[in-house]
Curated annotation (Swiss-Prot):
Coiled-coil portions: none
Family statement drawn from the similarity comment of this UniProt entry: Belongs to the eukaryotic ribosomal protein eS28 family.
One Pfam family from the record: Ribosomal_S28e
GO CC annotation terms, alphabetical: cytosolic small ribosomal subunit
Gene3D superfamilies linked to this entry: Nucleic acid-binding proteins
InterPro entries: NA-bd_OB-fold, Ribosomal_eS28, Ribosomal_eS28_CS
One of the GO BP terms on file: maturation of SSU-rRNA
NCBIfam families from the UniProt entry: PRK04007.1 (NF003080)
Keyword terms of this UniProt record: Ribonucleoprotein, Ribosomal protein
UniProt organism field: Methanopyrus kandleri (strain AV19 / DSM 6324 / JCM 9639 / NBRC 100938)
Protein name as it appears in the record: Small ribosomal subunit protein eS28
Length: 74
């Protein structure tokens, strides 16, 4: 077995889900949420992101980047 020193959470920024906006995707498999960035230069900023899988208010997500926002659901 090959060992790897890569840690996917190393570059991640924690963000707390503050509001669930709705479902999107062809079959509603993606949830659009507002998150508050908890660390880093964007700390305190609230952005909209799409999340795949179960999510609820208060959950902490680890974001690889905090620059990009999701387009609003129409």
């Amino acid at each position: 077995m090959v060992e790897c020193d890569y840690d996917p959470t190393e570059d991640a920024t924690p963000a707390e889900v503050v509001e669930i906006l709705g479902r999107t995707g062809m079959a509603g498999e993606v949830t659009q949420v507002k998150v508050r960035i908890l660390e880093g230069p964007d700390k305190g900023r609230i952005i909209t992101r799409n999340v795949k899988g179960p999510v609820r208010e208060g959950d902490i997500l680890l974001l690889r980047e905090t620059e990009r926002e999701a387009r609003p659901i129409e």
